[in-house]
């Protein structure tokens, strides 16, 4: 495709990874700033196919280094409107990954790119790359009649663009505030991430934004309208099975179809039971902490360890890939604002830990009576300190601890009774237990066996008193 470019362009390169050892430069990512933004503009304000570079160009960059990065695309056309901005923006991921040797991950303000050594050897500027991406946009989305792009690699300029973009993203996300799942007849699906997560089924409803945070219900509707054969499409939600978990017949049907039968149920607002699949582009990952029966959340920006001793990248690797991983869940940041936020599993009453910056960022989403009860890395760095914090603040999960202990004691008593009532010889597992010391004389102490949370398959068990040899 397109012989005029210094690198190959084809959908076959989607999913290609540029590893660190093969990387010429890294743009954005966890060590720097990375941004992509699409803005609708008047046709007269756009110089078609123009590429502007503000900051060091590719030829000015040092091999192995990481640079700040921002891409601002302006699009124009008779059918172009602001509602389409986020739709076009999400396709940046597709089209950049069509370019051989250029890796693109994530979206919005979390963009992470790498240029391979092989590709960098064939071009000394980002200009042909920009022209290639715009060519793909106008070919695949013909409603875009004119397009220009500005690449920023100067740190101060990237920071300035980032500040402006975050306000734009915030305004976009606020649009679905008063619209809920029960108010609509259709949801929307997105398969953009299937190049990296083949079984991922992203379902976008009014109360649940896409995992990447880039597509809300209105964006899905606009995308399906202008590009019916594209990666965003209608999902007839069908019959309601469970309002609390967010289970619908239509969602289950599409889950089975798009995952090639790997999953047959997705419950939109459940953390544990048939949760939404997680790709790898999610903005935040939730993780269950069994020691406190609570859920923590960690985002891409947090570079430290969570109380469970694991960082974001490790948990993301465990969670992603388009799987349903019980105990982990990827989400978009805006889902924190949903009135149905993991409502099947306690909602905010189950949240026990957040990175401080994320907590500050979503402050308006957190119920007022819980703000001081949710720990950050400044309050708890491990399980023990988290337990102490939650007890001190009387977090709602603490009330479940006593109930769990009582249940455990009851189970223990039942197990003791069962052992006491059992015959001394029984079918058991093909092994003979070591002889156990017995109480001698007139002692009535007997034997006490306590099994806690044990699953034992026994074929034959013999318990006998050891007799002294005469």
From Swiss-Prot:
Family per record: Belongs to the CdhC family.
Cofactor(s) needed for function: [Ni-Fe-S] cluster
EC number(s) on file: 2.3.1.169
GO biological process: acetyl-CoA metabolic process; methanogenesis, from acetate
Pfam (any one): CdhC
Enzymatic reactions: Co(I)-[corrinoid Fe-S protein] + acetyl-CoA + H(+) = methyl-Co(III)-[corrinoid Fe-S protein] + CO + CoA
MF annotations from Gene Ontology: acetyltransferase activity; anaerobic carbon-monoxide dehydrogenase activity; CO-methylating acetyl-CoA synthase activity; iron ion binding; iron-sulfur cluster binding; nickel cation binding
Native source species: Methanosarcina mazei (strain ATCC BAA-159 / DSM 3647 / Goe1 / Go1 / JCM 11833 / OCM 88)
SUPFAM superfamilies: Prismane protein-like
Protein name, UniProt field: Acetyl-CoA decarbonylase/synthase complex subunit beta 2
Gene name linked to the record: cdhC2
Chain positions recorded as [Ni-Fe-S] cluster binding sites: 190, 193, 279, 281
Cofactor binding description: Binds 1 [Ni-Fe-S] cluster.
Repressor as UniProt keyword: no
Primary enzyme class: transferase
């Amino acid at each position: 495709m397109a012989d005029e470019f210094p690198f190959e362009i084809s959908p076959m390169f989607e999913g290609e990874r540029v590893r660190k050892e093969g990387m010429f430069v890294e743009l954005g990512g966890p060590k720097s700033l990375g941004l992509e933004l699409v803005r609708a503009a008047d046709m007269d304000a756009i110089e078609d196919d123009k590429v502007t570079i503000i900051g060091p160009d590719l030829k000015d960059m040092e091999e192995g280094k990481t640079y700040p990065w921002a891409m601002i695309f302006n699009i124009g056309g008779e059918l172009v409107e602001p509602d389409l901005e986020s739709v076009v923006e999400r396709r940046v991921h597709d089209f950049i990954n069509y370019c051989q040797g250029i890796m693109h991950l994530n979206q919005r303000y979390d963009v992470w790119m790498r240029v391979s050594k092989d590709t960098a050897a064939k071009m000394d500027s980002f200009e042909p790359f920009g022209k290639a991406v715009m060519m793909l946009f106008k070919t695949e989305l013909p409603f875009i009649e004119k397009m220009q792009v500005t690449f920023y690699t100067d740190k101060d300029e990237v920071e300035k663009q980032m500040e402006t973009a975050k306000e734009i993203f915030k305004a976009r996300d606020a649009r679905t505030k008063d619209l809920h799942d029960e108010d609509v007849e259709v949801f929307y699906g997105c398969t953009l991430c299937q190049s990296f997560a083949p079984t991922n089924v992203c379902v976008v409803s009014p109360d649940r934004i896409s995992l990447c945070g880039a597509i809300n219900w209105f964006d899905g509707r606009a995308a399906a309208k202008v590009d019916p054969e594209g990666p965003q499409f209608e999902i007839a939600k069908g019959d309601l099975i469970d309002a609390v978990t967010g289970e619908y017949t239509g969602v289950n049907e599409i889950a089975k179809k798009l995952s090639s039968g790997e999953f047959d149920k997705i419950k939109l607002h459940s953390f544990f039971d048939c949760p939404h699949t997680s790709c790898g582009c999610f903005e935040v990952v939730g993780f269950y902490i069994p020691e406190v029966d609570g859920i923590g959340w960690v985002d891409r920006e947090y570079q430290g360890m969570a109380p469970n001793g694991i960082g974001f990248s490790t948990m993301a690797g465990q969670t992603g890939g388009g799987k349903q991983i019980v105990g982990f869940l990827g989400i978009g940041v805006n889902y924190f604002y949903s009135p149905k936020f993991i409502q099947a599993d306690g909602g905010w009453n189950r949240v026990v830990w957040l990175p401080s910056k994320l907590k500050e960022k979503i402050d308006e989403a957190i119920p007022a009576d819980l703000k001081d009860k949710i720990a950050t890395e400044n309050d708890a760095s491990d399980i023990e300190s988290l337990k102490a914090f939650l007890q001190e603040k009387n977090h709602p999960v603490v009330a479940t601890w006593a109930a769990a202990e009582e249940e455990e004691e009851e189970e223990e008593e039942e197990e003791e009774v069962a052992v006491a009532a059992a015959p001394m010889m029984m079918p058991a597992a093909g092994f003979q237990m070591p002889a156990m010391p017995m109480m001698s004389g007139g002692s009535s102490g007997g034997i006490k066996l306590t099994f806690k949370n044990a699953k034992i398959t026994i074929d034959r068990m013999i318990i006998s008193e050891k007799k002294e040899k005469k």
